[in-house]
């Protein structure tokens, strides 16, 4: 009997110890989360940039969620409430339509928040002159539709070399609001920059140096194309569907260059792309420039482009 009582007491003591340990671990985890700095970003790729540098020392508020378009998204009440607690807002800063519309309004919600322009130091690509003229002629309509890029291409992050600059700017913002962790941020930033260099090398090895052409519905890939010597042919221009004459021109160009893949993204209509693909005996392939897992997504994009680019 005494042996049974001792056994029961031993088991009870063990259970109490495990339970107490679990409570302590949970308390420490909750405390870590409670002490994390709140920062805001515009797009999902930036979430990886911040988290790779700062780890669990930050909570990231992403203002444009998965599946939403930077041209039309409006922040929710909950997002704006979170921004009110943010120490910093890391903007893309290159004419992103969402920021053009909402940045000043967001600043009024939290006047003490540090605003970091992550495109500082990046050479911004101007739109083609004819595109800019179209924009000026229909400025009011395009602004209402959310497609006013202010004459520049906002998709700077699609080039991993530009992403490195964005990461540097993110790091500088983080050490400004949290200098006590600057060494931790520096080590993580340097490690992530090496990952981006490795991704860039893989892209160059995969795509080669011969150049080539590809066709895409929305002009999201200009910086990627420029980085790797590619010619991007765009179906949509400044938020407008192609006219019948433009459709025929695109079909003729695709046939001339033996293009068999039309790239689209989930945030936009695929109707025109599917019509062109049908005419040229090609296929429509979805690639997402706004995916959260930036480096993993670069590998997916590169694989897709390696099959969709036609060499000169």
Predicted regions and their residues:
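Secretory targeting signatures
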Residues: 1-31
């Amino acid at each position: 009997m005494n042996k049974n009582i001792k056994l029961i007491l031993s088991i009870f003591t063990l259970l109490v110890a495990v339970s107490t340990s679990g409570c302590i671990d949970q308390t420490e985890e909750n405390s870590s989360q409670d002490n994390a700095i709140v920062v805001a970003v515009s797009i999902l790729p930036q979430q990886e940039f911040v988290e790779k540098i700062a780890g669990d020392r930050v909570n990231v508020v992403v203002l444009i969620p998965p599946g939403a378009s930077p041209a039309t998204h409006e922040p929710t009440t909950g997002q704006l409430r979170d921004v009110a607690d943010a120490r910093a807002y890391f903007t893309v800063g290159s004419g992103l339509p969402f920021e053009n519309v909402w940045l000043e309004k967001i600043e009024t919600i939290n006047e003490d928040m540090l605003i970091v322009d992550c495109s500082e130091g990046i050479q911004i690509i101007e739109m083609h002159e004819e595109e800019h003229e179209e924009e000026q002629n229909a400025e009011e309509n395009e602004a209402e539709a959310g497609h006013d890029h202010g004459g520049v291409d906002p998709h700077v992050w699609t080039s991993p070399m530009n992403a490195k600059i964005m990461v540097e700017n993110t790091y500088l913002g983080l050490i400004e609001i949290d200098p006590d962790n600057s060494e931790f941020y520096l080590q993580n930033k340097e490690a992530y920059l090496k990952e981006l260099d490795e991704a860039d090398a893989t892209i160059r090895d995969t795509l080669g140096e011969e150049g080539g052409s590809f066709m895409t519905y929305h002009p999201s890939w200009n910086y990627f194309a420029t980085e790797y010597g590619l010619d991007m042919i765009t179906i949509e221009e400044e938020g407008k569907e192609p006219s019948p004459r433009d459709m025929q021109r695109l079909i003729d160009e695709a046939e001339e260059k033996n293009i068999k893949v039309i790239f689209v993204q989930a945030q936009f209509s695929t109707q025109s792309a599917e019509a062109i693909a049908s005419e040229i005996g090609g296929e429509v392939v979805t690639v997402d420039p706004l995916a959260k897992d930036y480096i993993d997504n670069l590998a997916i994009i590169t694989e897709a482009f390696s099959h969709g680019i036609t060499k000169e």
